[in-house]
Regions:
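Jelly-roll (double-stranded beta-helix
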Residues: 2-4, 9, 16-137
Length: 137
């Protein structure tokens, strides 16, 4: 997140967290991991049990909408990743707020713009009508 601080407290399970340039850390129930705005990071379920966390992001801006749509698309697409059209749309529209570090630069700079154009021509984005406007950095 370019504009938000984020914090997660583990309720159940074990979370793995990685900040770019650092070693991974692992946290269990009652422990908290915090990421500062602009800090490239990722986190994952690092255990065998279900991971349940309580967290916050400040200021929230469009985080809830963005994550809800990414997860909705991922679920509809078989659970591995959002559809190419949804991924291209969401990462392009909200690029001032969020970045998904797992997507190669070539895909973001070349493939996504082509996919976005094809999606617009094919009418793939009608479900995003009324989506909140991105926050300007």
């Amino acid at each position: 997140h370019h504009l938000q601080d984020e914090s997660l407290t583990v309720i159940q399970g074990k979370i793995g967290a990685l900040v770019a340039g650092q070693q991974p850390t692992y946290h269990g129930p009652g422990e908290t991991v915090t990421f500062r705005r602009g800090e490239v990071h990722r986190f994952w379920n690092a255990g065998e049990d279900i991971l349940i966390c309580r967290g916050w992001a400040k200021p929230a801006y469009n985080l809830e909408f963005f994550l809800t749509e990414i997860y909705r698309s991922t679920k509809a697409n078989g659970g591995k990743a959002p559809s190419a059209f949804d991924g291209a749309y969401l990462t392009s529209k909200y690029k001032t707020e969020f970045d998904l570090i797992g997507i190669p630069m070539f895909v973001r700079k070349v493939i996504f713009p082509i996919t976005l154009l094809l999606g617009r021509l094919a009418g793939k984005y009608s479900r995003f009508e009324g989506a909140p406007e991105p926050v300007k950095a």
